[in-house]
Amino acid sequence: MARILIVDDSPTEMYKLTAMLEKHGHQVLKAENGGDGVALARQEKPDVVLMDIVMPGLNGFQATRQLTKDAETSAIPVIIVTTKDQETDKVWGKRQGARDYLTKPVDEETLLKTINAVLAG
């Protein structure tokens, strides 16, 4: 199955997403902020990144832009998973290079379908 990096500063959200993904056989890597997420993505080269937006330090938009503009990580798809549901945030996320944008709380079926679609290309 896929190696998925979750970048989220909420322990509760990290737990929920990890449980959903591991239940379906995915390997989960974790980072609690954007800077650590970018560093871990460069080091581990996950198949996909699930990125929150609101985090201390480097926010999810900034981290997504860094990942998608870096030759080392530009092929790694980023899916934003956040509580921010404004249309302007969705547009901005896509402009930063995110492949998709999901609003929390996200149900398991939607999350898995989105990951599979992004991985399929």
Swiss-Prot record:
The keyword Phosphoprotein applies. The modification 4-aspartylphosphate is found at D52. Keywords: Phosphoprotein, Two-component regulatory system. SMART domains: REC (SM00448). GO terms for biological process: phosphorelay signal transduction system. Transmembrane segments: none annotated. Residues 3-119 form the Response regulatory domain. InterPro entries: Bact_response_regulator, CheY-like_superfamily, Sig_transdc_resp-reg_receiver. It comes from the Bacteria. May be a part of a signal-transduction system that regulates twitching motility by controlling pilus function (extension and retraction). PANTHER family: PROTEIN PILH, STRESS RESPONSE REGULATOR PROTEIN 1. This is Protein PilH.
